[in-house]
Each structure stands twice: as structure tokens, then as C-alpha cells.
Curated annotation (Swiss-Prot):
Keywords from the named record: Hydrolase
Gene3D superfamilies: DD-peptidase/beta-lactamase superfamily
EC supergroup of this enzyme: hydrolase
One example GO MF annotation: glutaminase activity
Coiled coil region boundaries: none
Reactions catalysed according to its record: L-glutamine + H2O = L-glutamate + NH4(+)
A Pfam family assignment: Glutaminase
EC number(s) from the headed UniProt entry: 3.5.1.2
Name of the encoding gene: glsA
Name of this protein: Glutaminase
Hydrolase among keywords: yes
Family, as annotated: Belongs to the glutaminase family.
GO BP annotation list: glutamate biosynthetic process; glutamine catabolic process
Subunit structure: Homotetramer.
Length: 308
């Protein structure tokens, strides 16, 4: 028997997953994220009919980190012919950690997909080439999608990531050695880290990504952001590549497209129905929110929603 969406349902789900707090580990390789209290939980759902449901700390902002990679790809799709994008980044799952250099070397500087670090850095390089102010443009896009004027970068987080850029710089320089990188590496990484440092709440995330549940149309503004075909393609990539090297497990357990970030957030999409965001800072071994994945599994089971 399926359950109807409601604030009470989301509150009940958060109550059920609360015992999981303490079983994961907050991201500690970015010092600013290591200081985030681990006991926070939030969840929000936004339907294609414009109904909003929320529970927990759903209005509290956090660092979205790799969730921003979906927005970078979306922005690139509005600035480039699709064939130009897929010449420089693939569409296949990686199966390796998100910051791996080994696969990149073996595959001659062509990242497996846009949702691992190498792929997102290439997409950022492309945006750097096409936009005069890529950091400002990203904020404009997000503020329009959420109808929220004060969404911003956390410059402390961005600075913290710049101070620990060695791994990502190695990725970028390796791609440059294979002629798959056009701009100054440090300039692109600064933009990339700013994108990762964007702070949004679960409520803002579900509004922001509503276009992926609604044939490419933003539910709030009714603006066509990308084509229905492009929305399907992004959802497909989220399903196969959106959860680091835990994507297969996520598809098996939950069965909807999702994209996580090491800030503990996850955005997930049920096409033609709703977007859902969860936040719990503690991560599992794959770098996905441990309690967040459990919350999404409960929601998918209770409302009987899956793409399969």
C-alpha cells in the first residue's frame, strides 16, 4: 500500500533514520566541512504541481559540493552544442573513487562522466571559455531557479578547498597534457571550488532542480531551462553516475536518479512527479550521506515510486 506525501510522512522518516547518526563520518579532508555538527537532519519534497513538503532543518543551508556538478552540466548544455560536450567528457560510470587519476591516465585524459571531479572540472573549463563571469552567472541561474536572491558562495569553504587543491590540480594538469583543457588551471579550479561551496537548503534544492522532474521546465517560473530530452539525459547520468562509486547500490535500493555531495546533501528526482532533497552530514564509505540514503529508501518504498 502506498502512502501520500505529507509533512508528517517526512517527519516520520527522519524519526526512523535518526538512530543512524553516529554511524557515518563527516567529510574531514575539507577543514571547513569537518566542523559541521553531525546530528542535523533535513528533508524536502517539491512536486511538479508546486506542492512543497518539508521536515527537520529543511531551511538550513549547507555546502552542496558535488550536487553543483549537475548545475554546471545544465549550464554547459545551454551554451554548447551537445556534441562538443560529449567529445570532452564521457557518459559511463567510473567504478573508481571520484578523484581517481588512474582511469584518467589510462583513458588519455577523457573523464568517464561529468559527475566525477575530472568531468566536472572539464565542464567548468568549458564554462570558463564561454562565459565572461562564470561564478556570477551560476549564482544568477540558481537564484532564478529558486526565486531566492541571497543564495551565495561560502568563501571560507572555497578558500579551504583552494588551500588543498593538489589532487584536483593534478587531475586538471593531466587532462591538459592530453589537450583536454583550455584555460589556466588555477583560474578554472577557483571557479570549480566556488561552485562546490554554494550553500542551499533542502527547500531551495528541490525548487532549484524541479526542471529535472518537469520535462526541463522550472516548476516555479515555468521557464524552459533545457529540453525534455536533455532532462532525461541528465537524469540517466544521475542514475548511473550520480552517487560516486555507490551508484549501483543506490539504484538497486532506491531506484531513482540522485546526485550527492560530500556536504551530506542528496538531490533525487522522480520524473513527472517530484524532486526530493535530504541532508545529513555523516557519509558512508562511498562519500554519500548515510542517513540521507536511508531516508530516500524509506520514501521510495512508502510512496511506491521508482523509475523501474
Amino acid at each position: 500500500m502506498t502512502t501520500t506525501l505529507s509533512n508528517a510522512l517526512l517527519s516520520d522518516i527522519l524519526q526512523q533514520i535518526r538512530p543512524l547518526i553516529g554511524q557515518g563520518k563527516v567529510a574531514d579532508y575539507i577543514p571547513a566541512l569537518a566542523q559541521v555538527p553531525a546530528n542535523q537532519l533535513a528533508m524536502a519534497v517539491y512536486t511538479v504541481d508546486g506542492e512543497l513538503y518539508q521536515a527537520g532543518m529543511a531551511d538550513k543551508r549547507f555546502s552542496i559540493q558535488s550536487i553543483s556538478k549537475v548545475l554546471s552540466l545544465t549550464l554547459a548544455l545551454t551554451r554548447y552544442d551537445e556534441s562538443e560536450i560529449w567529445q570532452r567528457v564521457g557518459k559511463e560510470p567510473s567504478g573508481l573513487p571520484f578523484n581517481s587519476l588512474i582511469q584518467l591516465e589510462m583513458e588519455k585524459g577523457l573523464p568517464r562522466n561529468p559527475f566525477i571531479n575530472a568531468g566536472a572540472i572539464v565542464i567548468t573549463d568549458m564554462l570558463q571559455s564561454r562565459l565572461s563571469a562564470p561564478k556570477q552567472r551560476m549564482l544568477e541561474v540558481i537564484r532564478a531557479l529558486t526565486n531566492t536572491a541571497d543564495i551565495c558562495y561560502n568563501t571560507v569553504v572555497a578558500k579551504s578547498e583552494m588551500e588543498h587543491l593538489s589532487r584536483n590540480a593534478a587531475i586538471a594538469y593531466l587532462m591538459k597534457s592530453f589537450d583536454n583543457f583550455d584555460n589556466d588551471v588555477i583560474t578554472v579550479l577557483e571557479t570549480y571550488f566556488h561552485y562546490c561551496s554554494i550553500e542551499m537548503s533542502c527547500v531551495e534544492l528541490v525548487r532549484c532542480f524541479s526542471y529535472l522532474a518537469n520535462q526541463g521546465i522550472c516548476v516555479g517560473s515555468k521557464n524552459q531551462i533545457i529540453t525534455p530530452r536533455q532532462a532525461r539525459q541528465i537524469n540517466a547520468l544521475m542514475l548511473t553516475c550520480g552517487m560516486y562509486d555507490g551508484a549501483g547500490e543506490f539504484a538497486f535500493r532506491i531506484g531513482i536518479p540522485g546526485k550527492s555531495g560530500v556536504g551530506g546533501g542528496i538531490i533525487a528526482v522522480v520524473p513527472d512527479a517530484f524532486t526530493v532533497a535530504v541532508w545529513s552530514p555523516e557519509l558512508d564509505k562511498s562519500g554519500n550521506s548515510l542517513a540521507g540514503c536511508a531516508a530516500l529508501e524509506l520514501l521510495a518504498n512508502k510512496v511506491g515510486r521508482s523509475i523501474f
